[in-house]
Amino acid sequence: MKFVDEALIKVEAGKGGNGCLSFRREKFIPRGGPDGGDGGDGGSIYFEASSDLNTLIDFRYTRQYKAENGQSGMGGNCTGKKGDDLTIKVPVGTMVYDADTGELLADISQPGIPVLIAQGGFHGLGNTRYKSSVNRSPRQTTPGSPGESRNLRLELRVLADVGLLGLPNAGKSTLIRAVSSSKAKVADYPFTTLHPGLGVVRVSPYKSFVMADIPGLIEGAAQGAGLGHRFLKHLSRTCVLLHVIDIAPLDGSDPVADAKAILNELTQYNPDLLNKPRWLVLNKIDMLPDEKEREEKIQSIIKGLEWKDKVFSISAIESKGTQELCYALMQLIDEMKESEA
């Protein structure tokens, strides 16, 4: 399915029903009092997260949503029917912004919990409400108020425990395929991944975490170059970042320079991302079969980056070192979630 992570829509809550102007007219009761009923409230609009959705594609085709109006009141003190509420299903992780003001209205991350986005209009009052000792036959009513209308910008941020970042062709898609049931597209050219892919990594029957394959970044991504600009935001929700580096690039580029380019993009986009746990994953060790040469390459990269955190050497395509990496990730994620509890 095509991944769509932004959409613009308009929502309009229902208008409240008008109050009724009516008087009781029955045989032998020539001067019956007022009996105009109130209108019904307009329907409100709610957003609710659904685990069955993973894209905002539907909002590209349906851009306007309107809840039902409340019905007007009737004689005999009959209240108008309330307008039905409209509940709009969105993927887990959807951020709802007011498109006109930029205000964040809701961060919808819990499935099954409706979040009010547009309040329905208040019902109008019938003339019965205005009866008093000095006004036995009021002809005053009030109309229902209009419902809230908003222009919204929806933004979907991937909810994942682990985010993979690295240059195109660093082997991120291969890694996520190797450790999960994800069917990420893999080919020998840049930008194979055109949208964030999620994979569930199961380390035991009862323990798992979600890994996000963020599209490859290039220098200038923070300013919109390549595919990185619109996907860097997905890293903000992860617990830990895996910096995947091709240890033996076919184009002869310097892995240290490549890694520094990615770190520079993170710093420019959001320096807070550098405060997250970041582990170095040196991929494609199978391309350096000589053990001495491989170890020298690994140490030169670690020294060149002045890397202080954990380092893992793996071959995603041969699943070497991936199990150790997944167990370490699961342990870290468990510890982080326990500390937050």
Swiss-Prot record:
Transmembrane annotation, as ranges: none
Enzyme class: hydrolase
SUPFAM superfamilies with a match to the protein in the record: Obg GTP-binding protein N-terminal domain, P-loop containing nucleoside triphosphate hydrolases
Domain Obg: 1-159
CDD domains per UniProt: Obg (cd01898)
Region of interest: Disordered: 128-150
Domain OBG-type G: 160-334
Bias (Polar residues): 129-144
GO biological process, one term: ribosome biogenesis
GO cellular component, one term: cytoplasm
Cofactor(s) for this UniProt protein: Mg(2+)
Source superkingdom: Bacteria
A molecular-function term among this protein's GO annotations: magnesium ion binding
Chief location: cytoplasm
Pfam families on file: GTP1_OBG, MMR_HSR1
Function field: An essential GTPase which binds GTP, GDP and possibly (p)ppGpp with moderate affinity, with high nucleotide exchange rates and a fairly low GTP hydrolysis rate. Plays a role in control of the cell cycle, stress response, ribosome biogenesis and in those bacteria that undergo differentiation, in morphogenesis control.
Name of the molecule in the record: GTPase Obg
Organism: Legionella pneumophila subsp. pneumophila (strain Philadelphia 1 / ATCC 33152 / DSM 7513)
